[in-house]
């Protein structure tokens, strides 16, 4: 699998900063459009075994920025996170690696899961 980052819900300014990081790391970047939120993340990453869906997303849910790293080694991930921290982006709260488990999930499903995990890890869970 080729190295690619899927970027969800980035403003044009923050997307430009991410593009610079990707150029420096020689990594492909794909900005995912809102209407593609229902597409399986594996399909968007170019996995031939994951099929697309015909439905386009038109809702308001899932506004948070999210990065999905595909085909990354641990060293690649460390370099990306260091570049984000040192650069204009500073941080992106929701991040994940493409896995055999999440490759069939939609971007919206992954956003929901990561948002819940992030809230729990930062003590924002009402069920505590």
Model-derived features: positions:
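N-terminal, charge-rich interaction modules
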Residues: 1-47
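Helix-rich interaction surfaces within compact, conserved domain-sized segments
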Residues: 3, 16-24, 30, 77, ...
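Short, charged/polar micro-motifs that form catalytic or ligand-binding hotspots
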Residues: 8, 66, 70-71, 96-100
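Short beta-alpha junction loops
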Residues: 11, 35-37, 73, 99-103
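Short, intrinsically disordered low-complexity segments
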Residues: 37-68
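Noncatalytic linker/hinge segments flanking ATPase motor cores
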Residues: 45-51, 70-75, 106-115
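Mid-chain, well-packed structural core segment of small domains
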Residues: 57-87
């Amino acid at each position: 699998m080729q190295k690619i980052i899927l970027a969800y819900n980035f403003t044009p300014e923050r997307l430009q900063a991410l593009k610079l990081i990707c150029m420096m790391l020689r990594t492909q970047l794909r900005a995912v459009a809102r209407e593609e939120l229902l597409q399986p993340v594996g399909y968007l990453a170019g996995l031939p075994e994951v099929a697309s869906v015909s439905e386009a997303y038109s809702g308001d849910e899932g506004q948070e920025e999210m990065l999905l790293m595909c085909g990354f080694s641990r060293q690649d991930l460390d370099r990306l996170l260091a570049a984000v921290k040192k650069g204009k982006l500073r941080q992106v709260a929701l991040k994940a690696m493409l896995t055999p488990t999440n490759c069939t999930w939609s971007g919206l499903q992954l956003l929901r899961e990561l948002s819940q995990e992030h809230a729990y890890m930062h003590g924002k869970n009402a069920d505590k």
